[in-house]
From Swiss-Prot:
The keyword Signal applies. It comes from Clavispora lusitaniae (strain ATCC 42720) (Yeast). GO terms for biological process: ERAD pathway. This is Long chronological lifespan protein 2. Transmembrane segments: none annotated.
Length: 126
C-alpha cells in the first residue's frame, strides 16, 4: 500500500518538475517587437483606398483582395460591396483557383457555395 502511495507522490513530483521546466522555457524568451496594426496603417503611403483586411493600396474598395486568397474568393454583391467567402471544396478542376475569374463562376447548384450562390442568397432565392 505504501509503495503505491509512494509511486503516486513520486509521479506527481516528476510531472510538476517537468511542467515547471517547460513553463520556464517559455518565460525566458525575448519579447518580439511587432509593429501594431494601427502603426502599419498610420505608416502606409497609400494615397487611394487602404484595404482594412490586407492593407493593400487599391483604387476603390471593390478592388480589395481577400486576406487568404488560397482558400477564399472575392464575390461582389449586387450593391457593389465586396465579400470574401471560402472557396468551394471538391473536385472542380481548378475553376475557382484564378482570382481574376473565380467570381464569375456559378455552379447553379445551391449545394455549392460560390459567388453565384451568394447572388441568389442576396436575392432571397436560396
Amino acid at each position: 500500500m505504501f509503495r503505491i502511495l509512494y509511486l503516486f507522490v513520486l509521479c506527481g513530483a516528476v510531472s510538476a518538475s517537468i511542467f515547471n521546466f517547460m513553463h520556464d522555457q517559455y518565460q525566458h524568451q525575448e519579447p518580439r517587437h511587432e509593429v501594431s496594426f494601427e502603426q502599419r496603417v498610420l505608416e502606409s503611403n497609400c494615397d487611394k483606398y487602404l484595404c482594412p483586411g490586407t492593407l493593400e493600396c487599391v483604387a476603390r474598395p471593390q478592388d480589395c483582395p481577400c486576406p487568404y486568397p488560397s482558400s477564399q474568393m472575392r464575390c461582389v454583391l449586387p450593391n457593389g460591396d465586396p465579400l470574401c467567402i471560402s472557396k468551394p471544396t471538391g473536385d472542380y478542376n481548378g475553376k475557382y483557383d484564378d482570382p481574376a475569374k473565380n467570381w464569375k463562376v456559378d455552379a447553379k447548384d445551391d449545394n455549392v457555395r460560390d459567388c453565384g450562390w451568394v447572388k441568389r442568397a442576396w436575392e432571397g432565392r436560396v
